[in-house]
Structure formats: C-alpha cells, structure tokens
C-alpha cells in the first residue's frame, strides 16, 4: 500500500527549525535508534541527544542536532520533533562544537572529582551531549570544518 510522505516539523524552544515532507526519519530515542517511514503506526518516544536525519521527498538529507526532547507520529503521518535546542547542520561550526566538547569534558572531570553540586554535573553533561550531537550532525552532513 502506498502512503503519502510524512509531514515533519522540528521545533525548538525559540523557533521552528525545519518543516517539510519526508520519506524516512532516523532519530535516537532513549530506547535506541528508530526509523519512521510513511505508514508507520502512531508513535511517541523520548529523544536522546542525537543527530536527527530527515530524508526529504526529493532525496536530500536534512541533519539536525537535537539535545533530547520528544518525537511524535500521529495516524495521519504528522511528525513532530520537539526539543529545547536544535541546530541544522549548516548552522553548526564544527570547530566551535569540538572546542565546546573538549572544554565541557574537562569541566565535567573537574566537577566529578571535586564532588560538586549534582545539578552542575547534570548541566555540564547535558551541554556535552548537545556538543556531541552537533559534531555528529555535521559529520553526517559531510561537514568536516567551519
């Protein structure tokens, strides 16, 4: 049975990041990676920090770094990816993301050794995962430096 393309919206806290039609979406949930195709049953899951891949109807691949959130697919093929922070691969500075990752790793190690406030460690870990998702998104989009 032929199904119409998925209608996809990626929304962060401050903007609509991407909107369009897709024939395949690959995201990482807290349970593992999943692919969503037209005709997939309704679905709701918590996202892990990831590089979401959206294959458009014309065969292009949009790659978006997400810091977690939710992905929902309804019975009509409407997909919503809702996340606090999201960055399209073309907006990512790979060099900056790598510097952020390295700096956050160092800070995290220092805070863990000194047994700092768990909320500080949680915030640093969250920011580290976002930097890693940005690097992965840039890599998947074929962007090595910026």
From Swiss-Prot:
- Gene3D superfamilies in the record, alphabetically? F0F1 ATP synthase delta/epsilon subunit, N-terminal
Q: Provide the function of this protein.
A: Produces ATP from ADP in the presence of a proton gradient across the membrane.
Q: Which cysteines are joined by disulfide bonds?
A: none
Question: Is the keyword DNA damage assigned to this protein?
Answer: no
Q: Which GO terms describe its molecular function?
A: ATP binding; proton-transporting ATP synthase activity, rotational mechanism
Which segments show compositional bias classed as Basic and acidic residues? 92-116
Protein name, per record = ATP synthase epsilon chain
Q: What organism is this sequence from?
A: Cutibacterium acnes (strain DSM 16379 / KPA171202)
């Amino acid at each position: 049975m032929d199904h119409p393309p998925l209608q996809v919206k990626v929304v962060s806290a401050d903007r609509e990041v991407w909107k369009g039609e897709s024939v395949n979406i690959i995201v990482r949930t807290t349970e593992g990676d999943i692919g969503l195709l037209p005709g997939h049953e309704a679905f709701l899951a918590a996202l892990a920090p990831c590089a979401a891949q959206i294959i458009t109807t014309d065969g292009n691949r949009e790659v978006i770094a997400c810091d977690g959130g939710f992905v929902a697919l309804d019975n009509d093929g409407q997909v919503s990816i809702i996340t606090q922070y999201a960055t399209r691969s073309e907006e990512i500075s790979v060099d900056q993301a790598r510097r952020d990752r390295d700096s956050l790793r160092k800070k995290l190690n220092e805070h863990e050794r000194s047994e700092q406030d768990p909320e500080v460690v949680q915030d640093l870990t969250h920011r580290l995962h976002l930097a890693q998702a940005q690097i992965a998104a840039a890599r998947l989009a074929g962007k090595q430096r910026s």
